[in-house]
Amino acid sequence: MTEPLRIVFAGTPEFAAEHLKALLDSPYQIVAVYTQPDRPAGRGQKLMPSPVKQLALQHEIPVMQPPTLRAPEAQAELAALKPDLMVVVAYGLILPQVVLDIPRLGCINSHASLLPRWRGAAPIQRAVQAGDAESGVTVMQMEAGLDTGPMLLKAVTPITAQDTGGTLHDRLAELGPPAVLQAIAGLADGSLVGEVQDDSLANYAHKLNKDEARLDWTRPADELERLIRAFNPWPICHSTLNEETLKVLAADLAEGQGVPGTVLSASKDGLIVACGQNALRLTRLQLPGGKPLNFADLFNSRREKFAIGTVLGQ
């Protein structure tokens, strides 16, 4: 009987934890888990373990949290584990070539886009923002470049007109784990050969920036509608209303023209605001100190705040 593959897993957020769950339920041996150092979180800025660390500890898997994998000591520690394969999912640290060369079968990565489109840090949100018709997960053999390695397999899902960054994230977190298990089996028996990426089709999903979440009402309505969906649940698009921050969690396209940012109408159906082209109907908002509410509820209780002619973003 052959020994089970010795796998090292490296990942940090919830998306990665879903992949680790699948590996823990597989016949493979998870010999160690690598994850980012604990980070301050919440109002108290208390040090919090990553979702991957929490899951690994529940299953009594050794957890490694080196600040970098460039240090010779960290590389020696990894080599001592004698891994057959390293599975990397949203880890957040760069793996130098010496690390990629340690496992017998190399390192594979589950990336939340249909490569070579949307290499980089925020592929899910950028796909929604761009109005892409589909997204998916690509499992690739890692090399030193950023998301440039040969593609082993893909799992595809359509992006709907209602998808947010959050809903697409959750769907891809379901698609990724079985794809990784399939790729591992194919690598182990030698049946899977990677497809080289066409660099001419590549683009880069830049990390999300909170400043991008400020709504620029001079932009076309359809562009802003996609941005609002892409940036939900983080960092959440926002504007200002009477010098107070107004978070915008949901909107749809509406008829109307006017000076960008101007309230054209308000009713239980939503707050219609003029954009550079056409208008947006804001349907779910959050005022300072309040919780997210459907506009119908705000309209009933705070109607005076949303008078026609009021300008957002001033």
Swiss-Prot record:
(6S)-5,6,7,8-tetrahydrofolate binds at S113, L114, L115, P116. Its EC number is 2.1.2.9. It catalyses: L-methionyl-tRNA(fMet) + (6R)-10-formyltetrahydrofolate = N-formyl-L-methionyl-tRNA(fMet) + (6S)-5,6,7,8-tetrahydrofolate + H(+). InterPro entries: Fmt, Formyl_trans_C, Formyl_trans_C_sf, Formyl_transf_N, Formyl_transf_N_sf, Formyl_transferase-like_C_sf, GART_AS, Met-tRNA-FMT_C. HAMAP family: Formyl_trans (MF_00182). Belongs to the Fmt family. This is Methionyl-tRNA formyltransferase. The gene is fmt.
